Amino acid sequence: ATDELQRGGVLPGRIRRDGKPMILLITSRRRGRWIVPKGWPMEGRSLVGAASREAFEEAGIVGDIGPTPMIEYRYMKVLDDGSQVPCRVTVFGMNVRGTLSHWREKAQRQRRWFSLDAAADRLDDEELAAFVRTLDATPARLKPTEGWTRLKRSSGERLEGTR
């Protein structure tokens, strides 16, 4: 549909030392639902650019982002005035290398690591939840490969656990 609004998002993941894949989710600001970081592309920015910016601002995470979408899904976004608009979210894989202890939306959101099943159970969107469950068979999709872009953090930001 041409009246759909486009958003870019990330599915932030990492593989633990024991080989278990984990997904990072954040809460939505208004209703506190567990979601993936996503946002509107700014003028002249790509969907992957919007996705990486939102990962940094909404979740306080840095890492490597994949060049090709992992999944697209649709949902109805409730606007501040209560009206709803159809949105299509293009989700890129992100291998999380670090979490910031201070980030722009820290006071407005929670951020938590989940196993794939636990993440899927908490996600409202059925399509995205079903996709997250499939990652169990191919957790390597959460690892950066050739073509992934290393996201830089701004100077002055400190990663948790670093001095």
Residue ranges and their predicted role:
Residues 1-36:
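N-terminal strand-loop-strand
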Residues 90-134:
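NUDIX/MutT-family hydrolases
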Residues 123-163:
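Charged phosphate-binding loop/patch that engages nucleotide di/tri-phosphates or the phosphate backbone
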